[in-house]
Amino acid sequence: MSKRKVLITGASGYIASLMLPTLRDHFDLTLTDISEIDRDGNKVEGVNIANFIDPDRSKYEHLFENISGVIHLAFKPHTPRGAKTENAPIDRFDNEHENIQMANNIYRCAYDAGVSRLAIASSNHAADWYEHSLIHERKMDLVRPTDFPVSDNFYGWAKAAYELLAWPYACGIFGRKLETVMLRIGFTRPIIVTDYLSDSPMTEQTSSGIAEFKRNLGAYISPRDITQLFSRAIEAPNIENEHGIPFVIAYGCSDNTRRFWSLETGRKYLDYQPKDDTEIIYADEIRDLLTGDGTVIRGGKVGI
């Protein structure tokens, strides 16, 4: 039996590096990125160079020919790699607008080429206002994919826009339904205790290193779980909702004891069955940082 033909954008990026060892065996891949060199300076074999922000789709639309599914991971970071300072959050709109333009170019090329399924790397930040303002204050226990997508930053706004932008393609208004799965990916990096000590700058989502540690225990997705999630997003036989629209938004985290995102849609439509739980994987780290001698840390999920 022949392998399903799948195109991956952002193939030289970090998330792709977690999945490629397995996906190379599972699918017949076409890899694309703006560079064939990864963050560590290593060459990623088989990468086709393409800039999907370019409005001239004729430069890369051939890459979508005879493709069954697209995994879209590519994005333009708000601050160039190697820059000494980051752009201020209020100055990141133009960059994120380009990411939305890129997403539409991907959708349009896929639609025109007859691609049947998209698996898009959205982000938990598409609805991160709930986390920052309610979850952390323990006024809300779980964010669901059906909650109205509101973000307190332009990155999350762009990811929510990805999701809304795909709906016209999915609903069939242009002539056919382009099946689409939006995956709101969580925290993909290894959790290293020293990153969360008092003198650490690791406070991107919270006010302290300890709070960030607890947050990432809930948000983490392991390499094998994220690989399973994207594979199921491409292969799930039927993703139509109750209205007959093949469109799914699903959170991407492992089955963590401390998670604060619902996995209901991933389980229902994709048969996503995560294998890992940070409470087990990082049991020693949790014991050392949260329950060791002299600690006075409130238990449970992230929150005050």
Predicted regions and their residues:
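N-terminal Rossmann NAD(P)H-binding glycine-rich loop of SDR-like oxidoreductase domains
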Residues: 6-26
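NAD(P)H-binding glycine-rich loop region in Rossmannoid oxidoreductase-like domains
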Residues: 45-100, 109
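Flexible, glycine-rich beta-alpha linker
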Residues: 126-128, 154, 171-201
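Amphipathic terminal alpha-helices
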Residues: 278-304
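Alpha-helical substrate-binding/gating segment
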Residues: 188-191, 196-211, 218-246, 255
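Conserved Rossmann-fold NAD(P)-dependent oxidoreductase catalytic core, especially the SDR/UDP-sugar
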Residues: 105-152
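Active-site Tyr-X1-5-Lys
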Residues: 141, 150-180
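Glycine-rich NAD(P)-binding loop of the Rossmann-fold in SDR/ketoreductase-type enzymes
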Residues: 90, 94-105, 113, 157-158, ...
